[in-house]
UniProtKB/Swiss-Prot annotation:
Name by which UniProt lists this protein: Large ribosomal subunit protein uL14
InterPro entries: Ribosomal_uL14, Ribosomal_uL14_CS, Ribosomal_uL14_sf
Alphabetical UniProt keywords: Ribonucleoprotein, Ribosomal protein
The organism of origin for this protein: Nicotiana tabacum (Common tobacco)
Transmembrane segments: none
Classification lineage: Eukaryota, Viridiplantae, Streptophyta, Embryophyta, Tracheophyta
UniProt GO cellular component terms: cytosolic large ribosomal subunit
This protein's record includes keyword Amino-acid biosynthesis: no
Length: 140
């Protein structure tokens, strides 16, 4: 299994079900003015021939804005996935999933571009990204 690096974050993450392959469109859960994000790559994935790199909650991805403010569109920017629809199993045996796929726009260090997050975020994301956890109103 390939190592999954975390740029600019502390802590480790257990293996999760990867629910968001490259070319997935996810909602933007912050107040930057972006409506949705298009995943173009996943940070820290080495991969295998013909296998699409995929992301899960807590992963940093490179994304572009497909709908939103004109000054945000047509630029590649880092984002962190905070919710996914695909169920994953936690170490305590609980299967967890959200009702949508969502991410927040960050800088290379993992600091949020926006100041607020709409909706809950996963505990796995909150453990890895403290700046995102402080802006979240609910951590599940």
């Amino acid at each position: 299994m390939s190592k999954r690096g975390r740029g600019g974050s502390a802590g480790n993450k257990f293996r999760m079900s990867l629910g968001l392959p490259v070319a997935a469109t996810i909602n933007c859960a912050d107040n930057t003015g972006a409506k949705n994000l298009y995943i173009i790559s996943v940070k820290g994935i080495k991969g295998r021939l013909n296998r699409l790199p995929s992301a899960c909650v807590g992963d940093m991805v490179m994304a572009t804005v497909k709908k939103g403010k004109p000054d945000l569109r047509k630029k590649v920017m880092p984002a962190v996935v905070v919710r996914q629809r695909k169920p994953w199993r936690r170490k305590d045996g609980v299967f967890m999933y959200f009702e949508d796929n969502a991410g927040v726009i960050v800088n290379a260090k993992g600091e949020m571009k926006g100041s607020a997050i709409t909706g809950p975020i996963g505990k796995e994301c909150a453990d890895l990204w403290p700046r995102i956890a402080s802006a979240a109103n609910a951590i599940v």
